[in-house]
């Protein structure tokens, strides 16, 4: 047969260009690293930062799973008015409470961003997701 097939697929893990969106829940990683998504098949990794808040208040990657925080748990957003700073720290707005705390922003967690020593061990899955058996290294300042 004269038909040739590729022995393997190459995935480019280098930084791509940024695309501006109107989505307030769309995030991009500067430099290396992957968001951690808690899926039905276990933890998966992606650079896709097009998140939303589900009916239970969790930050999700639509149809894929819940976004993990630095504590290893899915991130629960307490209300729709939240911000994420350049370090991935998530804050929610709070009203003046009975306890006398001032209204303003309160930190509730941070996006878990990890990187890997060997990108060749990342296995490409559907929708820009990756799996691996290698240990993930936490990115300190994503």
Residue ranges of predicted features:
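A short beta-strand/turn structural motif
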Residues: 101-126
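Short C-terminal domain-edge/linker segments immediately following a structured domain
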Residues: 67-68, 90-92, 124-128, 142
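Small-polar (Ser/Thr/Gly)-enriched, low-hydrophobicity segments
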Residues: 2-93, 102, 112
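Context-gated lysine
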Residues: 2-4, 124, 140
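Amphipathic, heptad-repeat alpha-helical segments used for oligomerization and assembly
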Residues: 136-142
């Amino acid at each position: 047969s004269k038909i040739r097939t590729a022995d393997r697929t190459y995935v480019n893990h280098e930084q791509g260009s940024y695309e501006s969106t109107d989505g307030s829940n769309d995030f991009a990683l500067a430099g290396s690293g992957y968001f951690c998504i808690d899926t039905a098949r276990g933890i998966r990794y992606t650079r896709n930062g097009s998140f939303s808040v589900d009916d239970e208040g969790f930050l999700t990657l639509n149809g894929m799973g819940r976004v993990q925080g630095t504590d290893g748990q899915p991130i629960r957003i307490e209300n729709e008015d939240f911000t994420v700073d350049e370090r991935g720290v998530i804050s929610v707005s709070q009203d003046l409470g009975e306890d006398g705390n001032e209204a303003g922003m309160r930190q509730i967690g941070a996006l878990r961003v990890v990187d890997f020593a060997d990108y060749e061990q990342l296995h490409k899955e559907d929708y820009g997701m990756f799996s691996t058996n290698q240990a993930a290294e936490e990115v300190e300042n994503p």
